[in-house]
Amino acid sequence: MTTICSVKYNGQTAIAGDGQVTLGKSIIAKTTAKKIRRIYHDQVVIGFAGGVADAVSLQEMLEGKLESYSGDLRRAAVEMAQSWRKDQTLQKLEAMVIAFNDQDLLLISGNGEVLEPDESVVAIGSGGYYAQAAAVGMLRHASGMTASEIAKEAVNIAADIDVFTDHEIVTDEIEEK
Protein backbone atom coordinates (compact mmCIF):
# COMPACT_ATOMS: atom_id res chain seq x y z
CA MET A 1 0.00 0.00 0.00
CA THR A 2 1.15 3.52 -0.54
CA THR A 3 0.25 7.17 -0.86
CA ILE A 4 0.74 9.24 -4.00
CA CYS A 5 -0.33 12.91 -4.13
CA SER A 6 -0.17 15.34 -7.03
CA VAL A 7 -0.75 19.10 -6.87
CA LYS A 8 -1.15 21.68 -9.64
CA TYR A 9 -0.32 25.14 -8.28
CA ASN A 10 1.32 28.39 -9.39
CA GLY A 11 2.43 27.17 -12.82
CA GLN A 12 3.84 23.87 -11.59
CA THR A 13 2.46 20.36 -11.27
CA ALA A 14 4.21 18.16 -8.74
CA ILE A 15 3.85 14.66 -7.40
CA ALA A 16 5.07 12.99 -4.23
CA GLY A 17 4.93 9.37 -3.20
CA ASP A 18 6.29 7.11 -0.53
CA GLY A 19 8.31 3.98 -1.18
CA GLN A 20 6.61 1.38 1.00
CA VAL A 21 5.56 -1.96 -0.45
CA THR A 22 3.32 -4.10 1.72
CA LEU A 23 2.64 -7.79 1.25
CA GLY A 24 -0.80 -8.65 2.50
CA LYS A 25 -2.00 -6.53 5.38
CA SER A 26 0.98 -6.64 7.68
CA ILE A 27 4.36 -7.38 6.07
CA ILE A 28 6.46 -4.43 4.95
CA ALA A 29 8.52 -5.85 2.09
CA LYS A 30 10.34 -2.74 0.91
CA THR A 31 10.59 0.92 1.85
CA THR A 32 12.28 2.40 -1.23
CA ALA A 33 10.12 1.33 -4.18
CA LYS A 34 9.98 3.81 -7.07
CA LYS A 35 6.30 4.51 -7.71
CA ILE A 36 6.83 7.77 -9.57
CA ARG A 37 8.24 7.60 -13.09
CA ARG A 38 8.73 9.72 -16.18
CA ILE A 39 7.51 8.33 -19.48
CA TYR A 40 7.08 9.48 -23.08
CA HIS A 41 10.39 11.29 -23.60
CA ASP A 42 10.28 12.58 -19.99
CA GLN A 43 7.22 14.71 -20.85
CA VAL A 44 4.71 12.78 -18.72
CA VAL A 45 5.03 11.92 -15.04
CA ILE A 46 3.05 9.06 -13.53
CA GLY A 47 2.54 7.78 -10.03
CA PHE A 48 0.75 4.57 -9.17
CA ALA A 49 -0.82 2.75 -6.27
CA GLY A 50 -1.92 -0.86 -6.17
CA GLY A 51 -0.28 -4.03 -7.34
CA VAL A 52 3.19 -3.35 -8.72
CA ALA A 53 2.88 -5.78 -11.64
CA ASP A 54 -0.53 -4.31 -12.48
CA ALA A 55 0.86 -0.78 -12.33
CA VAL A 56 3.74 -1.68 -14.64
CA SER A 57 1.24 -3.16 -17.11
CA LEU A 58 -0.75 0.07 -17.01
CA GLN A 59 2.41 2.14 -17.44
CA GLU A 60 3.30 0.17 -20.57
CA MET A 61 -0.24 0.55 -21.90
CA LEU A 62 -0.23 4.31 -21.31
CA GLU A 63 3.18 4.65 -22.97
CA GLY A 64 1.83 2.81 -26.01
CA LYS A 65 -1.21 5.09 -26.17
CA LEU A 66 0.99 8.19 -25.80
CA GLU A 67 3.09 6.99 -28.76
CA SER A 68 -0.09 6.37 -30.78
CA TYR A 69 -1.45 9.84 -30.04
CA SER A 70 1.78 11.85 -30.30
CA GLY A 71 2.00 12.59 -26.59
CA ASP A 72 -1.59 13.86 -26.19
CA LEU A 73 -2.04 12.78 -22.56
CA ARG A 74 -5.77 13.43 -22.31
CA ARG A 75 -6.53 11.42 -25.46
CA ALA A 76 -4.11 8.64 -24.50
CA ALA A 77 -5.67 8.38 -21.02
CA VAL A 78 -9.21 8.17 -22.41
CA GLU A 79 -8.19 5.52 -24.95
CA MET A 80 -6.37 3.58 -22.23
CA ALA A 81 -9.41 3.76 -19.94
CA GLN A 82 -11.66 2.51 -22.73
CA SER A 83 -9.35 -0.43 -23.38
CA TRP A 84 -9.15 -1.11 -19.65
CA ARG A 85 -12.94 -1.15 -19.35
CA LYS A 86 -13.47 -3.45 -22.36
CA ASP A 87 -10.72 -6.03 -21.80
CA GLN A 88 -11.60 -8.76 -19.27
CA THR A 89 -7.95 -9.37 -18.41
CA LEU A 90 -7.29 -5.68 -17.83
CA GLN A 91 -10.43 -5.38 -15.68
CA LYS A 92 -8.72 -7.62 -13.13
CA LEU A 93 -5.82 -5.21 -12.68
CA GLU A 94 -5.77 -3.58 -9.26
CA ALA A 95 -4.01 -0.26 -9.62
CA MET A 96 -4.70 3.43 -10.03
CA VAL A 97 -2.56 5.91 -11.91
CA ILE A 98 -2.02 9.65 -11.61
CA ALA A 99 -0.60 11.12 -14.83
CA PHE A 100 0.35 14.67 -15.70
CA ASN A 101 2.26 16.75 -18.20
CA ASP A 102 2.71 20.50 -18.63
CA GLN A 103 -1.03 20.92 -19.29
CA ASP A 104 -3.13 18.17 -17.71
CA LEU A 105 -3.42 16.45 -14.32
CA LEU A 106 -5.46 13.24 -14.52
CA LEU A 107 -6.51 10.30 -12.38
CA ILE A 108 -6.98 7.07 -14.30
CA SER A 109 -8.99 4.64 -12.19
CA GLY A 110 -9.39 0.89 -12.25
CA ASN A 111 -13.00 1.36 -13.34
CA GLY A 112 -11.85 2.82 -16.63
CA GLU A 113 -12.53 6.42 -15.63
CA VAL A 114 -10.40 9.46 -16.38
CA LEU A 115 -10.92 12.27 -13.90
CA GLU A 116 -9.52 15.78 -13.75
CA PRO A 117 -9.57 17.02 -10.14
CA ASP A 118 -11.72 20.02 -9.18
CA GLU A 119 -9.26 21.44 -6.65
CA SER A 120 -6.03 20.77 -8.59
CA VAL A 121 -5.19 17.97 -6.14
CA VAL A 122 -5.46 14.24 -6.60
CA ALA A 123 -4.24 11.52 -4.26
CA ILE A 124 -4.43 7.73 -4.34
CA GLY A 125 -3.47 4.77 -2.22
CA SER A 126 -4.13 3.81 1.37
CA GLY A 127 -3.28 7.29 2.65
CA GLY A 128 -4.82 9.10 -0.32
CA TYR A 129 -7.72 10.66 1.56
CA TYR A 130 -5.40 12.03 4.26
CA ALA A 131 -2.96 13.42 1.69
CA GLN A 132 -5.71 14.97 -0.40
CA ALA A 133 -7.28 16.69 2.60
CA ALA A 134 -3.89 17.99 3.74
CA ALA A 135 -2.97 19.26 0.26
CA VAL A 136 -6.31 21.03 -0.23
CA GLY A 137 -5.90 22.69 3.16
CA MET A 138 -2.41 23.87 2.26
CA LEU A 139 -3.56 25.16 -1.13
CA ARG A 140 -6.29 27.19 0.54
CA HIS A 141 -4.30 28.57 3.45
CA ALA A 142 -0.52 28.21 3.02
CA SER A 143 0.88 30.85 0.72
CA GLY A 144 4.54 30.73 -0.17
CA MET A 145 4.75 26.97 -0.69
CA THR A 146 5.51 25.38 -4.05
CA ALA A 147 3.44 22.59 -5.57
CA SER A 148 6.27 20.18 -4.80
CA GLU A 149 6.45 21.26 -1.15
CA ILE A 150 2.68 20.89 -0.76
CA ALA A 151 2.63 17.41 -2.33
CA LYS A 152 5.56 16.23 -0.21
CA GLU A 153 4.13 17.59 3.04
CA ALA A 154 0.73 16.06 2.23
CA VAL A 155 2.33 12.61 1.89
CA ASN A 156 4.31 13.26 5.10
CA ILE A 157 1.05 13.99 6.92
CA ALA A 158 -0.54 10.85 5.46
CA ALA A 159 2.49 8.82 6.60
CA ASP A 160 1.96 10.08 10.15
CA ILE A 161 -1.58 8.65 10.09
CA ASP A 162 -1.51 5.67 7.70
CA VAL A 163 0.62 2.68 8.76
CA PHE A 164 0.89 1.58 5.12
CA THR A 165 2.67 4.80 4.09
CA ASP A 166 6.26 5.61 5.02
CA HIS A 167 8.39 8.76 5.11
CA GLU A 168 10.73 7.73 2.26
CA ILE A 169 9.22 10.29 -0.10
CA VAL A 170 10.19 10.93 -3.71
CA THR A 171 9.00 13.97 -5.68
CA ASP A 172 8.98 15.15 -9.28
CA GLU A 173 7.51 18.18 -11.02
CA ILE A 174 6.88 19.78 -14.39
CA GLU A 175 6.54 23.50 -15.09
CA GLU A 176 3.50 24.57 -17.12
CA LYS A 177 4.18 26.03 -20.55
Swiss-Prot record:
Record text on activity regulation: Allosterically activated by HslU binding.
Name of the top EC class for this enzyme: hydrolase
Single annotated GO MF: threonine-type endopeptidase activity
Subcellular locations according to the entry: Cytoplasm
Residues that bind Na(+): A159, D162, T165
Endpoints of the signal sequence: none
Intrachain disulfide bonds: none
Domain of life: Bacteria
InterPro entries hit by this protein: ATP-dep_Prtase_HsIV_su, Ntn_hydrolases_N, Proteasome_sua/b, Proteasome_suB-type
NCBIfam families: ATP_dep_HslV, PRK05456.1
HAMAP family in UniProt: HslV (MF_00248)
Protein family (similarity comment): Belongs to the peptidase T1B family. HslV subfamily.
Function as written in the Swiss-Prot or TrEMBL entry: Protease subunit of a proteasome-like degradation complex believed to be a general protein degrading machinery.
Protein name as annotated: ATP-dependent protease subunit HslV
Origin species: Lactobacillus leichmannii
GN (gene name): hslV
